[in-house]
């Protein structure tokens, strides 16, 4: 959607603030968790919690975008030197009080959507939900400024959503019975999604240094940041391969077709090096991430049909 002629607090402003292009990062882990359940349990999967998990993830991603927009604006991080996509509060599209109300409202809606999951996972789901909400707020408010963002991405865009989605969608079983295959795929998913954060922070390294935001890329430097980006994608495929032990092995290797796209994007990242042109790399990284998710899901489904 065109970001010109945006009226304050209009529907167009809210659509842009929700940043719909980021929703794939929330959808992919849930897709993989559902696919794992289908591969291991076939027709026994429970589709109601699958839908609820997807809705919860998407709403929480929008909430995280609102939180990020609001608190970065209040901290002065989003100024005229920002290289990334335009933010609603800093552009004046949405007033700070309206954004504050919106982020609280979306948090409440996410909690309401997630509440029925207690029926499938027990009261433990309250703790999981609270952890997601705390992560949503603390990431922008403080943790991303301490270089902990990448660890949190591995946990809350990998281990938690994939494993919890699998556990809720699969037939009722103890929490600690989640197969190692699912744990491995959740870790691989987190590694791939972290490439998005790495290229985002790589693009913003100079601005983050200036504003005191100590991201991991600021700490390790641009050169090591590029290396980290490359090896995250490679490590994801290695982890994915190591945890493949279903009888139908070859479909589990489908995610390897992600690597050529990832390496090509890495080379473009090295070539561009600095500036707003890195937004092209960010877009291609998001594409690669979604491709990885689709390949992994396809591998799971094929493993069921080929056993």
Walk through the language-model features, giving the residues of each.
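Topogenic membrane-insertion module of multi-pass membrane proteins
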Residues: 1-48, 52, 56, 146-149
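Small-residue-rich segments of transmembrane alpha-helices in multi-pass membrane proteins
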Residues: 28-33, 152-166, 189, 217-222, ...
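Membrane-embedded alpha-helical segments that form the functional core of polytopic membrane enzymes
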Residues: 43-68, 126-137, 177-199
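Acidic (Asp/Glu-rich) catalytic motifs at the cytosolic membrane interface
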Residues: 59-83, 195-217
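Multi-pass membrane catalytic core of lipid/isoprenoid biosynthesis enzymes
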Residues: 80-120, 213-248, 286-287, 292
């Amino acid at each position: 959607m065109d970001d010109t002629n945006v009226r304050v607090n209009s529907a167009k402003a809210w659509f842009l603030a929700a940043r719909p292009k980021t929703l794939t990062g929330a959808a992919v882990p849930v897709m993989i968790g559902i696919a794992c359940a289908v591969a291991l349990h076939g027709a026994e999967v429970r589709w109601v919690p699958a839908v609820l998990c997807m809705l919860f993830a998407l709403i929480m991603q929008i909430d995280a975008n609102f939180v990020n927009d609001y608190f970065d604006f209040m901290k002065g991080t989003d100024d005229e030197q920002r290289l990334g996509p335009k933010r609603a509060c800093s552009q004046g599209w949405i007033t700070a009080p309206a954004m504050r109300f919106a982020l609280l409202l979306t948090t409440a809606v996410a909690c309401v959507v997630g509440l029925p999951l207690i029926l499938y996972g027990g009261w433990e789901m309250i703790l999981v939900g609270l952890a997601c909400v705390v992560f949503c707020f603390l990431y922008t408010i403080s943790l991303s400024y301490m270089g902990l963002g990448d660890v949190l991405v591995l946990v809350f865009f990998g281990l938690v959503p994939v494993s919890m989605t699998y556990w809720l969608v699969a037939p009722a079983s103890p929490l600690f019975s989640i197969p190692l295959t699912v744990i491995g795929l959740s870790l691989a998913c987190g590694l791939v999604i972290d490439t998005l954060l790495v290229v985002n922070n790589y693009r913003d390294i100079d601005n983050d240094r200036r504003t005191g935001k100590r991201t991991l890329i600021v700490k390790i430097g641009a050169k090591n940041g590029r290396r980290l980006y490359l090896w995250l994608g490679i490590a994801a495929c290695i982890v994915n391969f190591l945890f493949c032990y279903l009888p139908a092995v070859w479909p589990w290797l489908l995610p390897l077709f992600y690597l050529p796209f990832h390496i090509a994007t890495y080379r473009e990242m090295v070539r561009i090096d600095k500036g707003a042109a890195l937004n092209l790399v960010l877009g291609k990284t998001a594409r690669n991430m979604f491709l990885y998710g689709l390949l992994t899901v396809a591998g799971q489904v094929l493993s069921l049909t080929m056993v």
